[in-house]
């Protein structure tokens, strides 16, 4: 009968050890799931933060491009106004030169004809 008690004790100890191992595995799996969930939450919050920073950066720098465009356009308009003013001053001289050239042709031999 002592053999039966010894075997029963061993079986009971094996069963308890199996339960302890099962609990440890379940605990580890639960911890892994919790860690994955926490990591996903942290990643989402980090992504939201970076998206917010990107939007702020875009808004901050989008206005700068508009200002540069306005300055460039003003510079171009100023240069065009200056060119038109110079053209208006020189218009009479150009017309005189054209009329003289048409009325008084000069006979020259072209350099390729020689």
Swiss-Prot record:
GO molecular function: ATP hydrolysis activity; proton-transporting ATPase activity, rotational mechanism
Annotated function: Subunit of the V1 complex of vacuolar(H+)-ATPase (V-ATPase), a multisubunit enzyme composed of a peripheral complex (V1) that hydrolyzes ATP and a membrane integral complex (V0) that translocates protons. V-ATPase is responsible for acidifying and maintaining the pH of intracellular compartments.
Protein's recorded name: V-type proton ATPase subunit G
Alphabetical list of InterPro entries matching this protein: V-ATPase_G (IPR005124)
Further facts: Present with 2280 molecules/cell in log phase SD medium.
One record GO biological process: proton transmembrane transport
Highest taxon in the source lineage: Eukaryota
Pfam families (alphabetical): V-ATPase_G
Binding partners and assembly: V-ATPase is a heteromultimeric enzyme composed of a peripheral catalytic V1 complex (components A to H) attached to an integral membrane V0 proton pore complex (components: a, c, c', c'', d, e, f and VOA1).
Species per Swiss-Prot/TrEMBL record: Saccharomyces cerevisiae (strain ATCC 204508 / S288c) (Baker's yeast)
Compartment(s): Vacuole membrane
Membrane topology value: Peripheral membrane protein
Residues with N-acetylserine modification: 2
UniProt xrefs under NCBIfam families: V_ATP_synt_G (TIGR01147)
């Amino acid at each position: 009968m002592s053999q039966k008690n010894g075997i029963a004790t061993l079986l009971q100890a094996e069963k308890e050890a199996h339960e302890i191992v099962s609990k440890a595995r379940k605990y580890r799996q639960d911890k892994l799931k919790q860690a994955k969930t926490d990591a996903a939450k942290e990643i989402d919050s980090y992504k939201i933060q970076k998206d917010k920073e990107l939007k702020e950066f875009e808004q901050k720098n989008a206005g700068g491009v508009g200002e540069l465009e306005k300055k460039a356009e003003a510079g171009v308009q100023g240069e065009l106004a200056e060119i038109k003013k110079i053209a208006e001053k020189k218009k009479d001289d150009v017309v005189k030169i054209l009329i003289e050239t048409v009325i008084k042709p000069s006979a020259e031999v072209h350099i390729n004809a020689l």
